[in-house]
């Protein structure tokens, strides 16, 4: 499910060129669809977590999977910006919203080595980013962009609906880790930690929200604009699309390496390393013009992306416990979605105004380094 949800989402940058060529839209306007998507996605993450608690993840995620497939089906019929914003900005966002319930299931099933378990689940995200964008680019060259979206819709619908039927919550107790985790009843584990009201009063909650904001601002700005930026530097479209594949492949490695570092040392250390690497990679891409320099950037950026992505769920469990895990994580994602929404628009506006992405990349680098500073301020408090 992670492969299809995030692989198709990160393919939007591949369709950027066809949209601009066919309709003559500016980059800022086209980016607005991604902005609306991430805003609605962030809002719905909070509600999907609550609905999953009440109705169960299988029902909620099945319905969302159907809506996701319909969203991509309707994308093949886009003729105006209103269509683009409705189908991609609303329908696809609704279909993506079970992301938080999926991560909360992992946090509750596994009581130890959460970083490693999260890495395994989220590796599907990196796999999707690695495989789907170049496949989408190949489809566009073969059958044009409208038919490509039809293929994506059918495949996404079949895989996500089928996979959602296997989801379930632990009925009595969390899975015992191979290392020998404590055998605590599920009901007890569910009530560990701070309530949502208690959590929002802490400094750590504010830091979590800023970490999410800076992370998603940088991430979505890059995934939306990096392909069209590379093409603008005379890198062939097929090779430019590979930058997303390098991000996806390195993302898988980053998830597993940083997940293990978090389990062995702490989420704080792993998060600091990830933000440092992301900031440095964004500085590197500013003067880059060659294919190899873009691939090197994509590898470093993707590794950092994977590290951050895998750490937020166990970080919430470490800082606040699992009592309100889904709602706290969903609220952080909601704040982060603001960054994800305005990031691509700001980057597109900067390019439309100046003809260059330089200022956009500098802004992303600054935000990444502020994320590093914020991660160093995190402190674990007693869960009472």
Predicted ranges, named:
Residues 12-16, 197-255:
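Extracytoplasmic gate region of multi-pass secondary transporters
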Residues 3, 71, 82-97, 213, ...:
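Hydrophobic core of transmembrane alpha-helices in multi-pass small-molecule transporters
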Residues 149-165, 359-377:
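Symmetry-related core transmembrane helices of the 12-TM Major Facilitator Superfamily/SLC fold
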Residues 19-20, 51-52, 134-143, 230-231, ...:
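Interfacial helix-cap and linker-helix signal at transmembrane-aqueous boundaries
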Residues 43-81, 262, 268:
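Conserved MFS/SLC helix-loop-helix module at the cytosolic interface between two early adjacent transmembrane helices
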């Amino acid at each position: 499910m992670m492969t299809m949800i995030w692989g198709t989402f990160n393919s939007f940058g591949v369709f950027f060129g066809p949209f601009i060529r066919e309709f003559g839209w500016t980059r800022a306007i086209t980016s607005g669809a991604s902005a609306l998507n991430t805003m609605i996605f962030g809002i719905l993450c909070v509600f999907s977590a609550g609905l999953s608690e009440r109705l169960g993840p299988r029902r909620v995620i099945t319905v969302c999977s159907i809506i996701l497939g319909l969203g991509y089906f309707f994308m093949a019929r886009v003729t105006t910006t209103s269509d683009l914003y409705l189908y991609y900005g609303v329908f696809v966002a609704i279909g993506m919203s079970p992301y938080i319930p999926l991560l909360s299931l992992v946090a509750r099933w596994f009581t130890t080595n959460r970083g490693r378990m999260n890495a395994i689940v989220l590796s599907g995200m990196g796999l999707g980013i690695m495989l789907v964008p170049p496949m989408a680019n190949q489809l566009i060259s073969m059958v044009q962009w409208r038919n490509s979206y039809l293929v994506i819709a059918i495949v996404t619908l079949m895989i996500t609906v089928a996979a959602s039927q296997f989801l379930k919550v632990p009925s009595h107790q969390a899975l015992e880790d191979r290392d020998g985790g404590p055998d605590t009843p599920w009901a007890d584990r569910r009530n560990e930690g701070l309530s949502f009201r208690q959590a929002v009063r802490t400094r750590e909650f504010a830091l979590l929200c800023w970490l999410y904001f800076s992370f998603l601002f940088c991430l979505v700005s890059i995934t939306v604009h990096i392909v069209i930026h590379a093409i603008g530097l005379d890198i062939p479209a097929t090779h430019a699309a590979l930058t997303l594949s390098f991000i996806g492949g390195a993302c898988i490695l980053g998830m597993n390496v940083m997940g293990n570092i978090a389990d062995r040392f702490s989420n704080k250390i792993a998060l600091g390393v990830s933000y440092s690497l992301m900031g440095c990679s964004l500085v590197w891409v500013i003067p880059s013009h060659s294919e190899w320099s873009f691939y090197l950037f994509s590898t470093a950026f993707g590794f950092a992306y994977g590290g951050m992505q895998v750490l937020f769920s166990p970080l919430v469990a470490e800082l606040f416990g699992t009592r309100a895990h889904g709602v706290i994580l969903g609220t952080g994602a909601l704040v982060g979605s603001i960054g994800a929404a305005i990031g691509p628009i700001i980057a597109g506006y900067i390019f439309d105004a100046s003809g260059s992405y330089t200022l956009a990349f500098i802004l992303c680098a600054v935000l990444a380094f502020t994320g590093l500073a914020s991660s160093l301020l995190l402190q674990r408090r007693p869960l009472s």
